[in-house]
Amino acid sequence: MTKNNEGFTHRNFAAVLQKYKYDLNLGDIVAGTIFSFELNGVLVDIGTPISAYLPIQEVSSNQDLNNFTSLNINDTREFFLLDYNIQSKQLILSIRRLEYIRAWKRIRQLLAEDSLLNVMIKGFNKGGMIINLEGISGFVPNSHLGNFQKSEQFNNKFIKLKLLNVEEKSNNLILSHRRALISQASSNLIVGNIIEGIINQITPYGLFIKVGNLKGLVHISEINIKNLEQISSQFKIGDTIKAVIIHVDKKQGRLSLSMKHLR
C-alpha cells in the first residue's frame, strides 16, 4: 500500500488530479477527517473524489507512539500529501513528514533566539549524549558536556542545553550543555573577576578547573611557571586555586582563566 511507484512523477500526479479537477500537488499540506481504520493504516476524507490513505508508518516520528493510539474516528487535522499509489488509486498521506517539517522550523527559530532548552536525555554512547528535541534526534559531544557525568541513571531525565550546530539537510543537530551552563552563570562571569576552583585535569597545555558546574581552562601561557615540566610538580588534581577570568566565550561555552593576572 505504501510502496513508492517507480517512474511516477509530479507530472503524472498532476494529470491524475486534473482528471478530477482538483488542485493539489505532492508536498502540499491538506486538511482531512479520519473516517475508517484498516489493518495497516487509516482512510482520510480530504474532500477529493480520490480516497486518501495514512499508512501506519507515517503516523508519527515519535517512536514511543504505539500505532494509532493518537488517532480517532472523526479526528480532523492536517496531513502532508506524500505520494499517489497507482495500484490502489489512493493519495498517500503522512503526519510524520509534517511533524518533521514543523520540528525543523521550530528548531531554526530556537537557534535564532539562542534559547535555553530543557531537553530529555535518551541515552549515551562513547562520543557523548543522545537527546531528542522536537522529535528530532540530537547529539551532545563529550567536549560539550562540561562536568556532567555520563550515566544510564540519567536516561529520560532532563538537562539544560543550547543549540550549537543545526544542519537540516544532513539531519545534523548538535547541542551543548557547556553553552547552557555559561549562559545561566553569565551574570557572574565578568572578565577581571577572581574565581576559586578545583583542579580536575592536568594536561601539557594547561589546567582544567572546576568552578561550580563550569569547567575553565588556565592555559600554560597563563601560569606563572618557567618551564612545562613544573606544571606536574607544582599542581595536583584536587588542589584549590584562584584565577582571573580573562575571556568568556558564550558561543562555544568556554571559560578562559589566568593565574598571571592575579594581584
Curated annotation (Swiss-Prot):
Cellular component terms per the entry's GO annotation: chloroplast; ribonucleoprotein complex; ribosome
Keyword flag Manganese: no
Ranges where the S1 motif domain occurs: 27-96, 114-178, 192-260
Main location: plastid
One annotated GO molecular function: mRNA binding
InterPro entries registered for this protein in UniProt: NA-bd_OB-fold (IPR012340), Ribos_protein_bS1-like (IPR050437), Ribosomal_protein_S1-like (IPR035104), S1_domain (IPR003029)
SUPFAM superfamilies: Nucleic acid-binding proteins
Keywords: Chloroplast, Plastid, Repeat, Ribonucleoprotein, Ribosomal protein
One BP term from GO: translation
PROSITE patterns cross-referenced by the UniProt entry: S1
Localization per record: Plastid, Chloroplast
Pfam family, one: S1
Family: Belongs to the bacterial ribosomal protein bS1 family.
Record protein name field: Small ribosomal subunit protein bS1c
